[in-house]
Each structure stands twice: as structure tokens, then as C-alpha cells.
Amino acid sequence: AIDSCKADMTIFDSSGIEAWVTENNPKYANRIIKQLKAYAKAMHFDDSYDPYKAAYGSMPSHSAANSDIKQLYIDGHFCYAYKFGIVTNGLGIVRHISFYNKDFFDHHPEIILEKKSDSPEEDKSVHDARLLIPSLQDLFAAHPLLNPHTFLGDAAFDSAGLYKQLLSGSTFGTDSNGTGRHFQKAYIPLNYRAGLENKDYSVNQDGIPFCPNDPSLPLKPEGTSRLRSGVIRYKFSCPKVKWEKDASTGKYHRVCHCKNPCTSSPCGRMVYIYPEKDLRAYPGTLRGTTVWDNTYKIRTTVERSINQFKDSFGLAGRKTQNEKTLHADLLLAGITQLIV
């Protein structure tokens, strides 16, 4: 039987189809890198100078043959390619393909394209983050029967603004009752250059509160509850608390067995966190748990689909720079996957 949970997932990633242009010849980049290394040696630059990043910054932002063939960072290297985005479900079945050409950007004037930095990884993250919501909006507009439920993406989408758009409001339209359509959960790893903070409690890198007397001791998640107002909250308790039976009443109650308790309560410390206050820290699920780890592994299905398109269906290595040809090949690859 088909796994309904995986079928309800929405996974996004981007890549590019390398075009047959001079700039993609390895000799082109190697010549520039060699010149920059010689320049750095002559100017006595220290070890912090990176000739590869300098080469990326000094190379043109698009191919001389066609301005639509952009300099991109894909599959661990920078090249000149047509960029596209692909959405699959957790089964790896393609749901939507966005070809990021002039027509796409004319349809989405809200996307602001800025000049590149000297970091290819940073450029890719910034560009992918700006393309995510418009691509998903196109998906759900084209397929109104699809419901956003669980989103999986990489750390490029780790920003407070994107969590708010993904998990609240009517980002993807409204249903028949006028209720806003948005995802219930988002599995996005944190970019640890920007850690988590909580004004009320001390939390670890996964957003789990920890003991005030022992930062290495995370509190134990005890599930979620919904208040009468409909607000969801997470409950955490001291991991050194055990349920014990009272011989006189026959009832069970909590007993804290900590030798250095952080609270005077015999039940031990309890913490309630309201995820709506910080969707980045609590995107409908908890990081650092077995459920998170097992679910996020499924994200690689979109990468396998991209590799299938490029390797099995022959998108990689196409000796053409014609946009319409490569766009058609990309769509035909998606259709072929659905047929086979």
C-alpha cells in the first residue's frame, strides 16, 4: 500500500541544467583561478585569501552567448546553467517543476534579484529562499485538490519570515470554508550560524528546554495539548521524575528524584512552550527527536529524482544552449517519471 504520510509531504529543491557554453569548459575557470593565485602570490596575500571564491566573484554573472544562462552553484560546483525548481512528495513522485526563466520572473515581480556576492553557497541559499514561496504558490494554484501538510527543505529556508509564510495565514489560498491554507509542519534544519533564543527558558540548539542546574540535561517532551482557545502548546518535564503509586490512595503521582532540584515542586520542573510564538524554533514538530530524524531523511527523495532526470533521462551533458529545448527536455523528463 502507498504510504499516505509520505504522499502528503511536499519537498522542494533546486538545481540547474548546464548549457553548452564556453564558460562551462574547465579550462575557462582554471585559467582565471591560476591568474588569481599568481596575483595573490605577487601581492603577498595571507592564507585567508581564497582564489576560488575570488574567481567566482570575478567571473561574469551570465554567459556571453546567452544572458539567460546564469552563473549558479549546483552539485558542489559553480557553472553556467538554466536554473529550475522541483517539488516532489515523500515517495519521490514529481508534483511540480518551475523553470526560472524570464516568464517566471515576469509572473512573480515580487522576487527581487540582487547582484551576487563572493560566496557561491550564500548566493544559492538566498536565491532558493526567495524562490520557494512563489514556486509553492504556483503548485497549489495549479493543483487545488492538493493540501499543504508537511514541508521538507534544507537549511537554506531557515528564516523566520519563511516559517511564518509556510505555517500560518493564507499563503497558499483558502479552502471552501474560507480558512487559510498553509503547512502544519515544516522539517527544516537550523542554520547554526543563527542559534535559537527563548526569553522565558534556556533552550538547546534543537529548541528543547534544559535543566537550569545542568545545561547538558534536556527536559523530556510529553507531547502536545490544545487549549480551549485552540492554541497548541508543548509540554516538557524533568527527566528525573518518575510516576509512583501512593499506597494509601492507590493513585499514581509524580516524584522527582533529582539530588539537586531546580524547583521546590515535588513534581519537578514542568515547562510549557507555545510554538506560535516562535515558529522557527517549533515548526509544528520538535527537532532532535527520533521522529524528526526519521522524517527528515525522506528529503533526499527529491535529490534522487533530480539525479534520475539528469542521469537516467539524459538532461546532463546536453550539447545545446537553447532555452526552449532544455525546458522541453526538463518537462518531458518529469512526464516520463510519472509514466514509468
What are these regions (language model features)?
Residues A1-T150, A155-S168, F172:
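Polybasic low-complexity intrinsically disordered regions
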Residues A65, Y234-G288:
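Long, low-complexity, polar/charged, intrinsically disordered or flexibly structured peripheral segments
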Residues Y192, A316, A333-I335:
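Extended accessory and catalytic-adjacent subdomains in large enzymes
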Residues A155-S237:
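Active-site/pore-lining binding-face segments in mid-to-C-terminal subdomains
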Residues D128-L131, T301, S305, H327, ...:
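Catalytic-loop motifs flanking and including active-site residues across diverse enzymes
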Residues Q337-V340:
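Short glycine/serine- and small hydrophobic-enriched flexible loop segments
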Residues T320-G334:
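Membrane-interface transmembrane-helix boundary segments in multi-pass integral membrane proteins
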Residues D200-C238, K242, P275-Q321:
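Short amphipathic alpha-helical "interface-anchor" segments enriched in bulky aromatics
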